[in-house]
Amino acid sequence: MAHESHESKAPAGAGEAEAVEVTVVLPAHNEAERIECAVEETERALSSFCRRYEIIIAEDGSTDNTAEIARKIAEKRKNVRFMHSDERLGRGRALNRAFKKARGEVLAYIDVDLSTDMRHLRELIDAIRVEKYDFATGSRLLKASHTQRSLKREAMSRLYNFLVRLLLRSKLRDHQCGFKAFSRDALFSILDEVEDKHWFWDTELLVKAQWRGFSVKEIPVHWEERSGGTKVKLLKDSISMLSNVLKMWLNERCGERGKGKGF
């Protein structure tokens, strides 16, 4: 059963608690070794340009001691909240659940491995907060991006994103970078249409956002593959995601575009 085990108290009264500028969600499944560092780095980056923020650790059915560590972090840090699920929800469902509990006007999520350089966080948030884009995403595949990862993963990523552009008519270069931000209103207007529960969530969200006419900014980032970092199983998850691209394309061809059906 999924439940929220801990939620840190707001630093002041209810009125101020509602006036959160930015919420950053950290999805965490078996991240005991990295979650504390991820929270520290995220809070350091956020506090340098934002006064009213919160960080939500969306712990997702971990079998190590991620939940215990995350609970202690939330108890010690006033701007950190902790959500726990006894069962594995999948990355997409865990993000959906956390965003629906978030208080920020700008909502974002960052992969806990911090492969994306945190110096880009302000640019990501300001794309929504200042430039008024509806969605913003880091990109490892723009000319100005700097990416370090294996040739196999680079080739698979380029092929995958090419097929998404070709079949689903996306204008973006990179759909899967775990470094995204959203306008609260824009995200909530489309969130229930996104049905994938795991890795394809990002692609489905960004493609449907474009189909709905939302503005999306793609930001070149410095990105470095971390040792033991990714939870993606290259062959299995690649086949699954390519299958989802084909399903989405077939549904769109059958007149289902924008209706959130067929997944």
Which ranges hold each PLM region?
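A conserved acidic beta->alpha catalytic loop
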Residues: 59-67, 114
